Regions:
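Aromatic-residue-lined binding/catalytic grooves and analogous aromatic/hydrophobic interfacial grooves
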Residues: 1-245
Length: 245
């Protein structure tokens, strides 16, 4: 599974392309999925998926918590299995340091993976840390977090940059904030202390307070078919008002 995280402070020297890929996480499982389903609960802001394999039913859910500034991802399975968590810094070497290019390295630090680098043309530094909580065995091998024989694993990601919103950021196009390393470390410690369920509870309370302000009904009846089934029927020329609404 590939997860992309974006930021709007990695603009290039031409002040274009402000939204950029900050970091990618690859989560690799040692199974083959069947009966795969996925969705997003727009009332709680939680993405979820499930599938069946030789390890039984696997359930995954993820959210980004605004109150705690942390991304949380949980996977649960009926039978113990393995997984790997690998971080990738995109666009390294694509541009030069003066043309919006970035530097970066990934290394193990205190039982976590740390991602650190700079955007020289913007005088910007960035930092991220990835931690895993699991009931299985956990090791760090070649810059990857490896989990074995686990029924449950929680992945936490915290990241930040030295960008500071101030007049100089617009007049000079260069960051004037502080190095984010300590800030990232303290956020991760706080998230680990809260634990997954508390992080989820705080996220839902925050997100739902906004989403529950309005409700609307677009009508129609849901007959239980999946999106791919509806699309196939639609391509065959059948009327599918559920797609058009």
């Amino acid at each position: 599974e590939r997860l992309q995280f974006t930021t709007n402070v990695f603009a290039n020297t031409f002040s274009q392309g402000g939204v950029s890929n900050f970091l990618e996480l690859y989560i690799e499982f040692n199974d083959v999925a069947e009966n795969y389903e996925r969705g997003l609960d727009i009332k709680t802001g939680i993405a979820f998926s499930s599938y069946k394999s030789a390890f039984g039913l696997t359930k995954r859910e993820a959210f980004f918590s605004y109150p705690d500034n942390v991304f949380a991802y949980r996977v649960e399975t009926e039978k113990p299995k393995d997984l790997k968590v690998r971080a990738v810094i995109p666009y390294l070497g694509v541009r030069g340091a003066d043309d919006g290019g970035r530097t970066g390295e990934i290394f193990a630090n205190d039982g976590c993976i740390e991602i650190k680098g700079t955007l020289p043309s913007r005088n910007l530094s960035y930092d991220a840390k990835v931690a895993v909580i699991t009931d299985g065995e956990k090791t760090i091998e070649n810059g990857e977090i490896v989990v074995r024989n686990a029924l449950c694993a929680v992945i936490l990601l915290v990241f930040d940059t030295s960008y500071k919103l101030c007049p100089e950021a617009f007049s000079t196009h260069r960051a004037v904030g502080e190095d984010p390393t300590e800030k990232v470390a303290s956020r991760l410690v706080a998230a680990l202390k809260l634990g997954y369920e508390k992080l989820k509870e705080r996220h839902i309370a925050d997100f739902s307070s906004i989403m529950n302000r309005v409700e609307f009904d677009i009508g129609g009846r849901y007959d239980g078919r999946t999106t791919d089934e509806l699309l196939s029927s639609y391509k065959e020329g059948n009327d599918e008002p559920y797609l058009e609404e």
